[in-house]
């Protein structure tokens, strides 16, 4: 997001807009505030309140939509067309991917230019997965790594798993997921613009798409907290739940190196722990 807003600033953009279930909106609002750019955020009205409060505190104008992220996208698009705002929606501009791909570069550097065997990533819009795959291709062209790639694993919720279904059905594009629901707002994306790019990275890497229950997500987030000292989001918990399932079936071998990505803080989902 830093790259996207920085480039918008270089281009003289005065207003930026995004539909988001939380984390992307917070990041855009923060960088836009620093750059002196007005930010407009469109969120589902049922997202946890910390996501909304963060954006407002950072100066964003927040519009709550009665619907899903796809409905927010339509509302944001109307503002883009009417007022000429710079659209930072997923894959509507090229710069967010350029920022996301630095995860791949950082990972390679930390592993001394030998990539892990498996990467498990929680997937909504999919920019993280797509960005890392782009980074690996670039690093091979630069001669920094060889042609060996990690097996990429995308994780979704049983309540919203369009990429999993498309992967299992062996289709190039994912169908719209009806009645999308999950406690992990970052995974509640019933239709992703970059679906074909995600599916391509999974298949080219001999990876897999896997879904799990909200209950397992939360249990695994708790396990991460109690063993690693990290207050992970449900999305992060989903990656551990997927890992445990794939180890149980021996899809992941005991000797393999595996990286799990936690993409958010449990603090923004504190309501999920209030009953404990």
Language model segments and positions:
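A short, small-residue-rich loop immediately preceding and capping a beta-strand
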Residues: 4, 8-29, 35-43, 115-125, ...
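Active-site nucleophile and cofactor-binding loops and adjacent substrate-binding regions
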Residues: 16-24, 91-96, 121-125, 212-213, ...
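Small/polar-residue-rich loop-to-helix segments that shape phosphate-bearing ligand pockets
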Residues: 39-115, 167-172, 180-199, 210
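Glycine-rich beta-alpha junction loops
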Residues: 69, 92-94, 123-127, 134-136, ...
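Active-site/ligand-binding loops adjacent to catalytic centers
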Residues: 70-85, 138-232, 275-276
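Glycine-rich ThDP/TPP pyrophosphate-binding loop and its adjacent helix/strand module
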Residues: 107, 112-134, 141-142
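Phosphate-binding loop/pocket of nucleotide- and phosphate-handling active sites
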Residues: 175-181, 237-276
């Amino acid at each position: 997001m830093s790259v996207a807003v920085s480039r918008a600033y270089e281009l003289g953009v005065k207003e930026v807009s995004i539909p988001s279930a939380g984390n992307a909106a917070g990041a855009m609002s923060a960088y836009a505030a620093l750059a002196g750019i007005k930010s407009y955020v469109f969120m589902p009205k049922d997202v946890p309140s910390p996501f909304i409060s963060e954006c407002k505190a950072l100066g964003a104008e927040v519009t709550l939509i009665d619907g899903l992220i796809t409905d927010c996208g339509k509302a944001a698009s109307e503002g883009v067309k009417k007022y000429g705002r710079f659209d930072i929606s997923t894959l509507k501009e090229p710069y967010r991917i350029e920022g996301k791909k630095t995860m791949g570069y950082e990972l390679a550097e930390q592993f001394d230019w030998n990539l892990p065997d498996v990467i498990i990533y929680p997937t909504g819009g999919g920019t993280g997965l797509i960005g890392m795959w782009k980074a690996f291709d670039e690093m091979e062209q630069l001669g920094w790594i060889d042609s060996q790639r990690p097996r990429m694993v995308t994780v979704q919720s049983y309540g919203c798993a369009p990429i999993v279904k498309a992967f299992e059905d062996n289709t190039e594009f994912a169908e719209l997921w009806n009645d999308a629901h999950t406690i992990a707002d970052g995974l509640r994306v019933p239709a992703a613009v970059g679906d074909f790019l995600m599916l391509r990275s999974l298949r080219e890497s001999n990876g897999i798409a896997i879904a799990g229950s909200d209950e397992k997500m939360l249990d695994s987030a708790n396990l991460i907290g109690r063993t690693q000292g990290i207050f992970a989001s449900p999305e992060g918990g989903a990656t551990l739940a997927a890992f445990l399932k794939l180890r149980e079936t021996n899809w992941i071998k005991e000797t393999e190196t595996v990286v799990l990505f936690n993409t958010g803080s449990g603090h923004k989902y504190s309501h999920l722990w209030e009953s404990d």
